[in-house]
Amino acid sequence: MNIKDIARLSGVGVSTVSRVINNHPDVKQSTREKVLQIIKDSNYIPNNSARILKQNNTKNIGVLVKGVFNPFFSEMTNIIGNIIEENGYTMILQQNDFNLYQDVETMIGFVKEKRLQGVICLGGNFTEIQEDSFEDIKVPVVLTSVNTISKKGKKYYSSVGIDNSKSAYKAVRYLIERVIKDCFGLGEVNDLGVSWWRLDGYKKALGENNIDIDDELIISGEYNSGTAYENVNKLLKKRKDITAIFALSDIMALGAIKAAIDNGLDVPRDISIVGFDGMDESKYYNPSITTVKQPKKKMAETSVELLFSLITTDGENKHVILDTELVERDSCFNI
């Protein structure tokens, strides 16, 4: 009996079983109870921390997630977990949502505590990486969907991501081409990573089309629908001239659409909204969301491939940039 058998009997993914074993909070209580009962009935002994500490040569890969409740990262975690298990390793998942500061120290502690062979970081605050930031980490590191304004220390880690500035630029240009005058940017303004680059693309698109950048139309907020709804609701009550919203994530776009509708606006006739990420739920919303689709499956697969390459061959670190796709749906006005 192995973890794949437990997953099959439970009707869930391998990564879900791994989260249950590691007592991760991102599991429904009913699912947790079902998996634990099957583990008990099967007399399955998990390769947990107690066993890890007895081993000199562990085969554990850490996945450190900032935004574990974000569907985008949840889907990537499942893909990564399955590949890790298929290669004979165990995924140790740890969420990092409550650390508001730099995540390098968190990663160092994670590697040492769990005695990892390597670590993949999904999201996170790595904006102040220095040349000596990875001195205490003796295992391969892959930063995925992590953009940093720092160019230092890149030879000490690998990365997988997209060109966030270029992708955001294309999305805002798409809005502008639909004769939109006042475009509202919705994101995490104080984030100097992914959000910084997406707002950079937003500003470039406005500037190149001779549209003034109105600071009142760049609203900071957490990456969730509730905060987005509150921020858009407040702005629309003050500004009746808004004709477009560029949301830095699909989750934010969901809240923005609800706020627009609650303010009596028709989406997209009165206001157009574009999201970012391309999460699966975006195509089932009403209206379905025009979005910048990230290649999450390819990002997840490439992250694990890079990590295993570094573990098995001791090769050089690489930095991979993948293409995005602007998916046209119903939340934008069609010319």
Curated annotation (Swiss-Prot):
Q: Which residues bind DNA?
A: 3-22
Q: What are the GO MF terms of this UniProt record? A: DNA-binding transcription factor activity; transcription cis-regulatory region binding
Q: Name one Pfam family in it.
A: Peripla_BP_3
Cross-referenced InterPro entries? HTH_LacI, LacI/GalR-like_sensor, Lambda_DNA-bd_dom_sf, Peripla_BP_I
Answer whether the UniProt record assigns the keyword Transcription regulation to this protein. yes
For this UniProt record, give its keywords in alphabetical order, as a comma-separated list. Answer: DNA-binding, Repressor, Transcription, Transcription regulation
Segments forming domain HTH lacI-type: 1-55
The record, for PANTHER family, names:
HTH-TYPE TRANSCRIPTIONAL REGULATOR EBGR (PTHR30146:SF149), LACI-RELATED TRANSCRIPTIONAL REPRESSOR (PTHR30146)
Function, as annotated? Repressor of glucanotransferase gene expression.
Question: What is the protein name stated in its UniProt record?
Answer: HTH-type transcriptional regulator MalR
Organism source for this protein? Clostridium butyricum
User: Lineage of the native species?
Assistant: Bacteria, Bacillati, Bacillota, Clostridia, Eubacteriales
